[in-house]
Amino acid sequence: MKVTCSWPTTPLYQAYHDYEWGRPIHDDQHQFEHLCLESLQCGLSWLTILNKREIIRQCFEHFNVDAVAQYTETDIERIMSTDGMLKSRKKIEAIINNAQAFQRIQDEFGSFCEYIWAFTNHKTLIYEGHSEGRMPAKNELSTRISKDLKKRGFKFVGPVTIYSHLQASGLINDHGKDCPCFNEINEANPVVYMTIDD
């Protein structure tokens, strides 16, 4: 696949761009994985997260939310001592906390996917102007979801982190219009065009 988005600069980045980024996620395990990875990325490059992704997966049992929600101090120490793993105790504790909050959303809405996709009426959003270089770090939608998640007890879910999550999990299609992925996603999923300020 020819990559026309400008940011994939390594083969690993390119594979992530081509086969994951922006493609709608409708299962809770992958939603939880992407949310955790975005939270871990705070202050780091995304390439760092991709390079450590398999180690992170192993540490968190492939993001089994029910398992992670029950982690104790012993698990935190295990993760902290894993070679190659990120050593931020606060972020590790936040993932455990977020797993518990994630479960509460599942209990209330039936699934996390039902909860988060309801914010876009179960459609992928396409914002006018984003593919012309006017892509924001956050927007009104990510700010609204961030506030709601924080109210529900989530941590490390600021508006910028949530905007990145919305892009990664396909609630927003921010591929460039000339990128093959842009049309692939639009043709396979219900979409709605938004103005830049919506």
Give each language-model segment a name.
Residues 1-198:
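HhH-family (HhH-GPD) DNA N-glycosylase catalytic core used in base-excision repair
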